[in-house]
Amino acid sequence: MASINLFLFAFLLLLSHASASTVIFYNKCKHPVWPGIQPSAGQNLLAGGGFKLPANKAHSLQLPPLWSGRFWGRHGCTFDRSGRGHCATGDCGGSLSCNGAGGEPPATLAEITLGPELDFYDVSLVDGYNLAMSIMPVKGSGQCSYAGCVSDLNQMCPVGLQVRSRNGKRVVACKSACSAFNSPQYCCTGLFGNPQSCKPTAYSKIFKVACPKAYSYAYDDPTSIATCSKANYIVTFCPHHRH
């Protein structure tokens, strides 16, 4: 994993013909972000599961063939020299290197599954929102569309879903309705555990209008999941515009 200029790296990606996929984590936020990486069951742990990414910096990471997992951004983090500390959002057990642990909701997620012929990827708000985030394929074949949430949902988050800073002055994250109310209707569980009975709610519709290219609830598949073949990927925190 190396810190590099994004535009140089994008050029290198276009020249790459390697069979393995590469992902760039690019931080366009005005503050540091600590990316978290959680592999799916049975998959390799990458980069210890987390690292610091300063503002306007990029890091590259090679994904093993057929790898699957999720990425998210932590912010407001402080860690000591041993890598122990805490993040205001997306914390993974108080560790710089998440070591396979997931992020504490609410957190925006980018999910990817590399297939032998076709990759599947998405950005999900099912576990809530903390940072604007996108995932975009580079040099792939097929539909290869953009997935992400550019809008700042913290600015439009309903009061019942808000997570505020310690001093209470600002909203730092926005819970999903499932996390906030723990209801089968919002969580798509029990009698609502299928696409026919679990429909968009007033809360998920707020997310969907603001971020039409992201999952707003568990069965939001048709407009949210993207596919591409033999691509590399750029995961951007705080993207300024849709691609």
Swiss-Prot record:
Keyword Glycosyltransferase assigned: no
The organism's place on the tree of life at top rank: Eukaryota
CDD domains named among the record's database cross-references: TLP-PA
UniProt keyword terms in alphabetical order: Disulfide bond, Signal
Membrane-spanning segments: none
Positions of disulphide bridges: 29-238, 77-87, 92-98, 144-228, 149-211, 157-174, 178-187, 188-198
Pfam families hit by this protein: Thaumatin
UniProt KW Transcription keyword: no
Signal peptide (UniProt feature, chain positions): 1-20
Family statement: Belongs to the thaumatin family.
PANTHER family: OS03G0233200 PROTEIN
Name of the protein described by the UniProt record: Thaumatin-like protein
Organism of derivation: Arabidopsis thaliana
